[in-house]
Structures are given as C-alpha cells and as structure tokens.
C-alpha cells in the first residue's frame, strides 16, 4: 500500500506510474478525500480537546463555588458527549474509505522497468543455454507422461474435476526429487531458512501480501472464512507481520515447498490439457526481507538463486524483465524465468521474482529498527519462485525425452532417485 503523505508530495509521480500500468490518474481525488478526512479528524480532535478542558474547568468552577459557570460547563460537556459518537463514526468511515481505495492501488514501478501494455512489452534480459537438438519428434509432457503410464488426468478428473493431475510411480518420485533438490540448494548453498508454514491463512494475511481485497476471485475460501494459499509468499512474508525487526539481522531469507491453490478464474480455455495450469500444484518459494538500501541488489541475488536451479538441471531458459502492464499488483520490478519446452516449441514461465519495496510491509505493519537511526522504517519485501515444481517436471520430461519414449534423469537428481537414471514405461 502506498503512503498518503507520499502521494500528497508526489501526485504527478503516482499518476505517471498509474498511466504506465494502463490505469486512470487518481491523485487529485485521493488528495481531496484525504483533505476531507483530515478536516473531519481535526474537528473531532478539537471536540475531544474541548470536552477534556471543560471537564477540568468544572472542577475549578466548583472549587470557586461558581455554580452558574459549573452548570454551564456541564451542559457544554454533555452536548459534546452527545455529538462525539457521530463525529467519531464519520472519522472512522472516512479513514476506512481512504484505506480501501489505497489498498486497491498498484505499486509504483521502478524507473528502469520497461513501459508496455501487456506481455508483448516484456524485454529479454538474457538467454542461458541452448535448445536441445534431436533426431526424434518432441512431445508435450502429457503425451510423455501418459505414454509412460505415470500421469493420469482422467482419474484426477473423476476425483476432483478439471485442472488436476495424478502422478504415479517414477514420475511422482521425480517430482518429489525436484522439490527436495531445490530445498537443499536454497538452504545449503543460498542461505535460506526452510519453513513449513500453514496452508490456510486469515483475511489479514492475504491483505498483507496484496491478494485481498482485489483478487478474491482467484482464490479458494473455506467455509470458516480462511483461505487456501495461492503461494507460500503469503505465510512466509506474513511471518514478520506487526513485528519490529533488528536492522542488523537483515536480510531474512525464507524458503518453503508447499502445495499452492488457485481458482484460475481468468484462465478459461488456456492450457486446458496437461499440468501447466492447475488448481493445485507444488512450488518452492523464496522470500527475502531487507532494507531500502539493499532491496534492489537482493532482487538480483534472488533471481540468480532461482536461475541456479535451472542451470543445474541443464535446462535452456531466458530471463524476461516484465513491462509495467504485465507486472504484478504489488511489484516494483519483476523478472520472469521462462524455460524452453520443446513439446510446445515455446518458452513458458517457471519462476517470477519480484521486489516490492515497502508496499507489502505497510499493509502488514512490518518494520525494522537500526542502531544508527531513531525510530523505525518499513522493511522491504521480495518474493520469487525457486521454482514451480510441476513446471520443472514438465521441462525435465520434455527436454530429457529419449527416442524410445523413456526420460533420462538429470545428473543432479540421480542421488534423489536412488541411483535411477532413466524413467521407463510402467510394466
């Protein structure tokens, strides 16, 4: 969430940022609403101050045996007490109205983010590796998985409906191996702390990371009002909610392997076959909490950590800098890692790494204290996929497909597969 004081002082900057995101200017209406709010608040505070002063004056008048003045003051206090509830309610209403509008305004992009309307404006930052060259025909992951007998979409549909998958046998083991490999890499080499967070969270947690109130339709809600997490970013980032951290201990880096749940409300007709777009999928998440001075560098570091997964798996990919029109609601800058899928003859997103500045921290009231400075500041938050496990499985089986329909196991995963080097058709 943006700071209304910052908006008052940077109205043109906000409107320019909104224009880059394809949104209408809002600064004038926000500042006008804030002026009304502050006028109401000032009036309320003056009423409260006068009530308190008059109450003290009653005692002084009584001590001086000035009953006429005392009665007059009592009447004034009574009148103020009667008027205060309505004034307090009006102040709360205007505060809530302003907060609601602010909570729906996207973050301000960094200056070096390319301007564009949608994914067509994204820019290739770098290409890593090269596309595989084979003599045999590439296949899509669902053709390979069903051919091996380890991927069952019809069975999943009978149990849960569309956009679910049953993995069995060696493909289930391969997906588990991928997740374990990623966690080991991030915890043992990249300095992240492994966390097993709740998969159900409250409204305020979803609000803190920016999923609510704007994106409720993309989420699954339980009958008791909790939400299934769409990403472990939500619980990991909210671990510092309402906390004051010691600045000397920053950055904090957390990682988790969790199921993620998304309704895919806006994805009708897209990727209806296979595992690319599921209601439930596994993902390794990376979250960093740092300060303003180091958050941009931390973004580069986090992206490199996610890239290392793909490098060690021997996968060809590209890094995309997302443009203003394709960036997420809470992000100031985002890099997407897009892995090459031979079966689709296309690059597909497998990781998204974003720096959010203090946007989420303001919503969570997450701050830090430095020994060198007085007071507290909001932390800066970052999140990224390190990486999506299901999509990594897709990439591995499409890129490591053999002519006989079997799939070679990437060398880095062999120890996690008990020495198995090839996934072959179920007997």
Swiss-Prot record:
GO molecular function: ATP binding; serine-tRNA ligase activity
Cell location: Cytoplasm
CDD domains noted in UniProt: SerRS_core
EC primary class: ligase
Protein residues bound to ATP: 262-264, 349-352
Pathway terms, separated by semicolons: Aminoacyl-tRNA biosynthesis; selenocysteinyl-tRNA(Sec) biosynthesis; L-seryl-tRNA(Sec) from L-serine and tRNA(Sec): step 1/1
EC number(s) from the headed UniProt entry: 6.1.1.11
PROSITE patterns named among the record's database cross-references: AA_TRNA_LIGASE_II
Binding site for L-serine: 231-233, 285, 385
Superkingdom assignment: Bacteria
A single GO BP: selenocysteine biosynthetic process
Catalyzed reaction equations: tRNA(Ser) + L-serine + ATP = L-seryl-tRNA(Ser) + AMP + diphosphate + H(+); tRNA(Sec) + L-serine + ATP = L-seryl-tRNA(Sec) + AMP + diphosphate + H(+)
Stored Pfam families: Seryl_tRNA_N, tRNA-synt_2b
Coiled-coil region: none
GO cellular component: cytoplasm
InterPro entries found in the cross-reference section: aa-tRNA-synt_IIb, aa-tRNA-synth_II, aa-tRNA-synth_II/BPL/LPL, Ser-tRNA-ligase_type_1, Ser-tRNA-synth_1_N, SerRS_1_N_sf, SerRS_core, tRNA-bd_arm
Family: Belongs to the class-II aminoacyl-tRNA synthetase family. Type-1 seryl-tRNA synthetase subfamily.
Notes concerning its domains: Consists of two distinct domains, a catalytic core and a N-terminal extension that is involved in tRNA binding.
Self-association and partners: Homodimer. The tRNA molecule binds across the dimer.
HAMAP family, per database record: Ser_tRNA_synth_type1
Protein role: Catalyzes the attachment of serine to tRNA(Ser). Is also able to aminoacylate tRNA(Sec) with serine, to form the misacylated tRNA L-seryl-tRNA(Sec), which will be further converted into selenocysteinyl-tRNA(Sec).
Protein name, as recorded: Serine--tRNA ligase
């Amino acid at each position: 969430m943006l700071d209304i004081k910052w908006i008052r002082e940077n109205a043109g900057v906000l409107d320019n940022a909104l224009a880059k995101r394809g949104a209408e200017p809002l600064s004038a209406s926000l500042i006008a609403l804030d002026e009304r709010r502050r006028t109401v608040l000032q009036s309320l505070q003056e009423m409260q101050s006068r009530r308190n002063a008059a109450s003290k004056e009653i005692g002084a008048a009584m001590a001086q045996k000035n009953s006429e003045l005392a009665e007059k003051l009592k009447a004034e206090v009574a009148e103020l007490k009667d008027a205060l509830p309505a004034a307090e309610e009006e102040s709360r209403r205007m505060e809530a109205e302003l907060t609601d509008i602010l909570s729906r305004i996207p973050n301000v992009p960094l200056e070096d983010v390319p301007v564009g309307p949608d994914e067509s404006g994204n820019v290739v930052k770098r290409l890593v590796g090269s596309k595989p060259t084979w003599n045999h025909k590439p296949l899509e992951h669902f053709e390979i998985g069903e051919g091996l007998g380890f991927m069952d979409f019809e069975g999943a549909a009978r149990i849960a409906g569309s956009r679910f998958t049953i993995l069995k046998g060696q493909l289930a083991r391969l997906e588990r191996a991928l997740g374990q490999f990623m966690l080991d890499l991030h915890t043992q080499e990249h300095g992240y702390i492994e966390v097993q967070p709740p998969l159900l969270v409250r409204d305020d947690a979803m609000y803190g990371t920016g999923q609510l109130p704007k994106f409720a339709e993309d989420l699954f809600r339980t009958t008791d009002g909790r939400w299934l997490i769409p990403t472990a970013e939500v619980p990991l980032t909210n671990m510092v909610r309402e906390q004051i951290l010691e600045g000397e201990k920053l950055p904090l880096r957390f990682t988790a392997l969790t199921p993620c749940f998304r309704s895919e409300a806006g994805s009708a007709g897209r990727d209806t076959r296979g595992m690319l777009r599921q209601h439930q999928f596994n993902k390794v998440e990376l979250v960093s909490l740092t300060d303003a001075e180091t958050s941009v560098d931390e973004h580069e570091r986090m992206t490199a950590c996610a890239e290392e997964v793909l490098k060690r798996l021997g996968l060809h990919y590209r890094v995309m800098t997302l443009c203003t029109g394709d960036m997420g609601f809470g992000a100031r800058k985002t890099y997407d890692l897009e892995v090459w899928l031979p079966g689709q003859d296309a690059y597909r997103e497998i990781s998204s790494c974003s720096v959010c500045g203090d946007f989420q921290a303001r919503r969570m009231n997450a701050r830090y204290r430095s020994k060198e400075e007085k007071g507290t500041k909001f932390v800066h938050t970052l999140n990224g996929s390190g990486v999506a496990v299901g999509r990594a499985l897709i990439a591995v089986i499409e890129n490591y497909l053999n002519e006989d329909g079997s799939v070679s196991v990437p060398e880095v995963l062999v120890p996690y597969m008990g020495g198995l080097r090839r996934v072959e058709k179920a007997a």
